[in-house]
Amino acid sequence: MLLKFRSLFIVMIPILCWAGACDKNDNGAPVGDMPDPIKIDLRSTEKDMVSADQAFAFEFFAELFQEEALDEDKNFMVSPLSLSMALSMTRNGASGETKEAMRKTLNMDAFSDDDLNAYYKKLKEALLKTDPSTKLSIANAIFTNQSINIKPDFIHTNQSFYDATVKAVDFGHPATVNVINKWASDNTNGLIEEVIGGTRPEDLMYLLNAIYFKGIWTSEFEKKNTDRRPFTYENGIRENVDMMKQTAKFNYTADENMQLVQLPYGNEAFSMMVLLPAEGKKVQDAVTATRGEGYWEGLKSGLHQAEVELSLPKFKTEYSKRLNEVLTKMGMGIAFTNGADFSAMSDAPAKIDFVKQDTYISTDEAGTEAAAVTTVGMMMTSLPARPEKVVFNANRPFLYVIQENSTGAILFMGAIKNFD
């Protein structure tokens, strides 16, 4: 089976398509006699959630692909998992129409908040155990405005189910941006060093999810086989790139839309699925196909072992994107307006100011290193009333009273009239 990458292609690294939080598996054990992946047992409802998560992932990617279509040769990568987790934490602070819009956008409107939160918690715990040869870290954090009261139930829920680190900070201080960016860098092994450029006093909070992944191919490419080979863009232009090559047994399938090969990492708990559009078709055609109901699972059901003569280019992509417009198209536009209802988060009227994702991926002969940070910036739509500014200059005679505040009991009273 000959599989050469002659045009643009889509790569997917399913982290079992699921979620986690402020924990990590950083064993990085060498690939060899690895234990079998730990099977993740799911209840019927949880399987439905996985399917809903996958549908959201393909819908999100397709909408973003359309938005990036003007720049035909632009590489980009996103993490649907990171986005869904960050928005799920945010959803815990939403109420009414805003909450329903977010649930529908995430394709999770059929499930209760309790079920969703428990689902992410369960999957996180399983993800971090399934492959000791793969480094995996998934972290959540919430930075809140120290001047504003945040509702305890909102904090408790996100700490309990998402292991979110919560820290109250001064958004008016110029150094606060460094605290948030350092958290992002620390939780992506330094791959993503900056996610915001500054903070403002009117910011209510920042909710962040970070994912770091480093996987070693189960069947590594030999560097001696990598050489410069042509890669053909969709406009017909050819460019020589570093093309890795190997012939080995991989799971493979194909239909009228694309070829699909599955490249496993470590003990095969994780894999990169590479989708190559069929001859004469474009990446847009493959993206459109994946949006079809049941298409992805149907395609994967055809995977079978074949001896694949594989050519895959080395690649590295860094990407940053504000997602407000895409998420608005997907149905949660109300969350970005002054009509948003985040009353389960705080009594201060607030809306989502922005949702932004920063990503990094590098794939070479040894494997893949990837990271993503999703940042949800919340801002107050009306600032709390500022205290009246007055001048109190006791430069003339005055009285004073010393009292116990809760009862008003007066302990001492006096007058200051002179300083002779």
Spans of features found by a protein language model:
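Detector for small/aliphatic-rich hydrophobic stretches
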Residues: 2-9, 16-17, 22-171
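A structural signal for short secondary-structure junctions
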Residues: 266-267, 352-355, 391-396, 404-406
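C-terminal or internal capping secondary-structure element at the end of a domain, subdomain, or sheet
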Residues: 397-420
